[in-house]
A protein has these predicted regions:
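C-terminal membrane-solvent junction of multi-pass transporters and transport-like membrane proteins
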Residues: 5-7, 343-347, 390-444
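Hydrophobic transmembrane alpha-helices that form the core helical bundles
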Residues: 55-62, 66, 70-136, 145, ...
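Membrane-interface loop-to-helix entry segments
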Residues: 133-188, 218, 241-246, 382-395, ...
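TM-loop-TM module centered on a large, flexible mid-protein loop between adjacent transmembrane helices
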Residues: 76-77, 240-316, 336-380, 385
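Membrane-interface "cap" regions at the ends of multi-pass membrane proteins
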Residues: 1-43, 47, 52-61, 69, ...
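Loop-to-transmembrane helix boundary motifs in multi-pass membrane proteins
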Residues: 7-13, 133-134, 231-233, 243-248, ...
Length: 480
């Protein structure tokens, strides 16, 4: 290897940090803590990482190594291993999953803005839901308008705000552990951390919440293009992924322990209203309390909220634009999409595609106008995203199984495991875990939330089948 080639290679440790900032976030800690009865989530985190995340990450490494020249991600992998039709469905799923994600970004923006301005949870929650949802819908339309201009003016701001939020998440853990020594007279929760107290109650609520953890640890396929840029990929990549897993496990456990000194699970689960409030506000309360421990008032919370304001708006715009381009710009799958959706405006943007995003995401936003309470809306969106977003991971595991079926014809510099049976078992295992968690996650005691969790993925799936039929009808008519 020449000196120039060595200079362009990245170390396994650099890869681990790149992947960590992509996969992990402070919201994963707070959601796990709230949904899994505080410190009891530690048990679930450990098993989720050992039996799901590590094999998932290593399978992605093998896929990235085998298709190092393919830039289309999962859709390209399936096109190479199966056929164009399945590649289309993978691309469609990736785009469709973002419909619910886009619907949640406007609410996240308003919540962050409210905390930055009013510095409390009560003001936002006191507004009538229909007004909040109307404002959220207007933010969606604003995001669609900016995306239709072909501009990504907030991309650099997103990077800066995302980095700031990421750094603050790590600082939170360090500063929270140091707080008792600095401010010993402050009020801290004394959590029971005995082994027996950490074993969760395996009931319906537990199993229907597992999709939250699957959603939290997913997304590492985004780093697959870097597999062959790592020094000695066959050894460097798995080392980087194992390091990533250790970092994420450590962050999840230490973050949970830090939060257990602040929040009492009994208070969180005291009522449905209390639970909804913690789902919507726990991250802001965490930084607000941290500021009180260090005698700086609401400073940490305001910084976190302002970073979130920028991030939520920027992610909204990028989530409208990027998945749509991945779906409609793929030459291999254009034949399955009606020509009307390929319409490009003067800025090179698929204008009709953006209109479809506005209609579908807007429908979810407006449907939630009838939900009693803004905090309940955010809880619904958190659960809905945990049901829909992991569905795109199913195609990763399908692509991996297809790759192993073509073991002799598609070479890869890095292999997760050499044994075919073991490799296919893990591919099938991760596929099954994802599918089961998504289906179980649909259940909710609230009938409206349950209906939303079922109807949304069903409608998006049906629409994914309808488009190829419309495209085929167009092509048949054009031949006559």
């Amino acid at each position: 290897m020449s000196n120039k080639e060595k200079a362009t290679k990245i170390s396994w440790l650099t890869l681990a940090f790149m992947a960590f900032s992509t996969v992990w976030g402070f919201g994963n800690i707070t959601n796990g803590f709230v949904y899994f009865n505080g410190p009891q989530v530690i048990f679930s985190w450990i098993f989720m990482f050992a039996l799901y995340f590590i094999p998932y990450a290593l399978m992605v490494g093998e896929l990235g190594s085998a298709f190092k020249n393919e830039g289309g991600g999962v859709s390209s992998w399936l096109h190479q291993t199966t056929n164009a039709k399945l590649a289309y469905y993978a691309g469609w799923t990736y785009w469709a999953c973002h419909i619910t994600y886009i619907a949640s970004k406007g609410s996240g923006f308003l919540k962050a803005l409210s905390w930055a301005v009013f510095r409390n949870a009560e003001t936002y929650d006191s507004f009538p839901t229909r007004y909040i949802q109307l404002a959220t819908f207007c933010i969606l339309l604003l995001g669609c308008y900016i995306a239709s201009l072909g501009l990504n003016p907030l991309k650099k701001l997103l990077t800066a705000a995302g980095t700031c939020t990421f750094v603050m998440s790590l600082l939170y853990i360090l500063m929270m552990f140091a707080a008792p020594a600095i401010t010993p007279t402050a009020e801290y929760v004394h959590a029971n951390l005995s082994f027996s107290s950490l074993i969760p109650n395996f009931n319906v609520t537990y199993f229907t919440s597992l999709s939250i953890l699957v959603f939290a640890v997913g997304g590492c396929e985004k780093i697959s293009p870097y597999v062959n840029k790592v020094e000695n990929p066959s050894k460097g990549f798995p080392r980087g992924m194992i390091t990533l897993a250790v970092m994420v496990v450590a962050c999840a456990i230490l973050g949970t322990l830090a939060m257990s000194r602040m929040f009492d699970p009994a208070v969180i689960n005291a009522s449905a209203e209390s639970f909804n409030a913690y789902v919507a506000n726990s991250s802001y309360w965490a930084f607000q309390k941290l500021g009180q421990y260090y005698h700086v008032g609401d400073l940490f919370m305001i910084i976190y909220a302002l970073c979130n304001v920028i991030s939520q708006l920027a992610v909204l715009i990028l989530s409208i634009d990027a998945p749509l381009r991945m779906l409609l710009d793929n030459e291999h799958t254009k034949q399955f999409i009606p020509q009307a959706l390929h319409k490009v405006n003067a800025h090179g943007v698929h204008s009709n595609g953006i209109k479809m995003v506005a209609v579908l995401s807007g429908s979810i936003i407006l449907a939630q106008s009838f939900v009693p309470g803004a905090a309940a809306v955010l809880r619904q969106l958190t659960k809905l995203n945990s049901v829909c977003m992991p569905m795109r991971y199913l195609w990763v595991f399908a692509a991996y199984i297809a790759l192993r079926n073509a073991y002799d014809t598609i070479p890869a510099e890095y292999r997760f495991v050499k044994n075919q049976a073991v490799a296919k078992f893990f591919g099938g295992w991760c596929f099954a875990v994802t599918a089961v968690c998504c289906v179980l996650g649909m259940y909710d005691k609230d009938p409206f939330t349950f209906a939303l969790n079922v109807i949304t993925p069903v409608v998006l799936t049906v629409l994914g089948f309808i488009l190829p039929a419309l495209a085929k009808r167009e092509q048949t008519a054009a031949k006559k």
